[in-house]
Amino acid sequence: MEIRKKPNIPMCLVLDSSSRPFMTLLFTILLFLTGLASAVGAVGGSPTAGFKPADDILIDCGSKSSTKTPEGRVFKSDSETVQYIEAKDDIQVSAPPSDKLPSPIYLTAKIFREEAIYKFHLTRPGWHWVRLHFFAFPNDKFDLQQATFSVLTEKYVLLHNFKLSNDNNDSQATVQKEYLLNMTDAQFALRFKPMKGSAAFINGIELVSAPDELISDAGTSLFPVNGFSGLSDYAYQSVYRVNVGGPLITPQNDTLGRTWTPDKEYLKDENLAKDVKTNPTAIIYPPGVTPLIAPQTVYATGAEMADSQTIDPNFNVTWNFPSNPSFHYFIRLHFCDIISKSLNDLYFNVYINGKTAISGLDLSTVAGDLSAPYYKDIVVNSTLMTSELQVQIGPMGEDTGKKNAILNGVEVLKMSNSVNSLDGEFGVDGQRASMGKQGMVATAGFVMMFGAFVGLGAMVYKWKKRPQDWQKRNSFSSWLLPIHAGDSTFMTSKTGSHKSNLYNSALGLGRYFSLSELQEVTKNFDASEIIGVGGFGNVYIGTIDDGTQVAIKRGNPQSEQGITEFHTEIQMLSKLRHRHLVSLIGYCDENAEMILVYEYMSNGPFRDHLYGKNLSPLTWKQRLEICIGAARGLHYLHTGTAQGIIHRDVKSTNILLDEALVAKVADFGLSKDVAFGQNHVSTAVKGSFGYLDPEYFRRQQLTDKSDVYSFGVVLLEALCARPAINPQLPREQVNLAEWAMLWKQKGLLEKIIDPHLVGAVNPESMKKFAEAAEKCLADYGVDRPTMGDVLWNLEYALQLQEAFSQGKAEAEEVETPKPVAVPAAAPTSPAATTAAASERPVSQTEEKDDSTVDQHSGTTMFTQFASLNGR
């Protein structure tokens, strides 16, 4: 083997035939090691590996020469950046060197007594950091502590009437304001505008490109938990960037030159948290997460629950961050499971301002492995803000793996308001922001007070007009209803409602129950109080403080429905009131609980009275009345609100019966609004097997006809008294809809009806009922009737059955003479004729047009002739 070097030619290896195999292997190993080193460098090497900012403009304002910071960054002097500034006159001031300052850029400043503008040409538009550095050092030109000024861009207000002495109590402290702006133009300007009679100043300016993946356009909103899009349309101010459980991270150790502060000053109780750490090289970024989001040093440290090994660690670790309640906030939470020994062993909840932000977080599942970073972006609306932003982590409280929780980092960014301001309520053009929360509260208070006076007047008037016949005092009195003023509700209670109150009436969410109150009424959710079990969780019976018996549905944190459906049901039921819809009384979401409180339905689900529970069989008339009640409830959902509502989970277990067997539709966790004018909602397929609309399944387009199909299956359950799906039966009988329609087409449907109905059903009534079910089960939604049409046919079937029953009773009476003496016949009087006529069924033509009686039994008219409050 020889090595030859030619002039101006790169060195190369020339191998003889004897050494080629060995050298080939050596060369392969060399290439492998080179690639491995590159890979390690990409993950754990240079902090800024993988990203070089297109724009990196650093200015040391007031400096006569360039300045190098401790982290090695070079800020250019005034003379090197003169092309950026437009100012009538500016004053340069400086301070003597000091080792107490974090950077030498704070030793000089530029003072403006009139408006001054810095203009920059961007190499590449997009996300940029804008960092403004301030330090009010003593000088003989101007008292910088008293300088009052604003800083604006073409679109955003960054600082409004800013005064350093107001922003920081420590006059010797430096201040850095960091902003993240999505710049869409090639030009960017910073305007310093002193207040009249004052001055503006600046020590240093940074304008640095940020990676596009730093903030995506979509996140998650808090309460209700929903998707939040349009994040790229906001400007952001970094308020807190915290390395939980770890030390200060300086810009030279961050992937994007950021500063991460320790979390101890924000911890509410340090005794509840325990710092944990691992070697940063153990952190492996999964696909979709890069070191640019946060460096390995953030994910390699964290805080877990202290004493997590105790039998019942029922507490949360809490961090409090002082905040401005007038703004929305963007919260980025960083997680990395560095405490578990195996996968799927750590489940915990995350709360923001007392609301559940993440339920049942399993980091090894969402991140794909242990020691794999994961982050979550959450938008907190200003209506949920107070003077402090609170972040909490805690165990799920169920038997789900290790009772522990972990948090590795927190970033809190203020979001620009409706006039694109990050400071104050005025925009660049002087326009004022929309009414803030305090103004909303004041206005809401006035509306509520006005509504209370109106309601009080109505009560007094009704009291004066009350019935004087005290034997009628048990009759329904409308003046005892809750008083509504807009979306606010006022109610009285025998105990003054000292345990709980109506929560956020502006949201119309009903009464908020404390967890301790619900634990008391359910004997701490004792199994003996369970009256039902569903996919969402257990249902308990209880009696609240005013003596009302209620059903309390406690969500299972591992439920497939989850927190989204929990909030959906609250919002749906809080705005719906109908005789045939179950009423929501209130809810509780304390400590990650998802609890709904309903009116108690003593006779339980419709299904229990048809099969499986050995209850007394329902008569055909009772089944018809129950189906009619459910149809009325669904018809109201589809047409009785400004936006139609599709239930999406109609089935016999979601039709509940009260003590009088009045049917009420329940369980709105999967429901969807349909905007007026739209005929469908494109959404993922959800529902219950056996009731699912085949067209919805094929096209993933949900319509009100999807509910109609499901209701058709319920009708067959009522007729045949068997489940919608029974896999234990022969193959052709498994699916009730297919099996029943097969017999219907043969004209032999009566062969498969509930044996308890044989001989007790009017054939014409059953025929009309079966026709209604068949139409509901049409393959295509366009061929199915509306719920109003279904309701008409069911009421007709009920009238046929009532006529049949009455005729049968009269025939039996004729056949069985009474063993008493019969007086001589007397002439029939007009009164007798009238009485006899009143006993026969009332025909459609004999009904009064203004009749709007809505009884669950004894129907005397068809619903289509009554006011259904439809759209």
From Swiss-Prot:
Entry-linked Pfam families: Malectin_like, PK_Tyr_Ser-Thr
Membrane topology field: Single-pass type I membrane protein
Cell membrane is among the record's keywords: no
InterPro entries, per database record: ANXUR1/2-like (IPR045272), Kinase-like_dom_sf (IPR011009), Malectin-like_Carb-bd_dom (IPR024788), Prot_kinase_dom (IPR000719), Protein_kinase_ATP_BS (IPR017441), Ser-Thr/Tyr_kinase_cat_dom (IPR001245), Ser/Thr_kinase_AS (IPR008271)
Class in the EC hierarchy, top level: transferase
Biased composition (Low complexity): 817-839
Compartment annotation: Membrane
Transmembrane portions of the chain: 440-460
Residues on Cytoplasmic side: 461-871
First-listed, main subcellular location of the protein, grouped into a coarse class: membrane
Carbohydrate attachment residues: N169, N182, N253, N316, N381
Residues of the Protein kinase domain: 525-797
Start-end of Polar residues biased regions: 854-871
SUPFAM superfamilies: Protein kinase-like (PK-like) (SSF56112)
Cellular component terms (Gene Ontology): apical plasma membrane
Chain spans, region Disordered: 808-871
Binding site for ATP: I531, G532, V533, G534, G535, F536, G537, N538, V539, K553
Record: active site: D649
EC number(s) on file: 2.7.11.-
Similarity remark: Belongs to the protein kinase superfamily. Ser/Thr protein kinase family.
Name of this chain's protein: Probable receptor-like protein kinase At2g21480
Native source organism of the sequence: Arabidopsis thaliana (Mouse-ear cress)
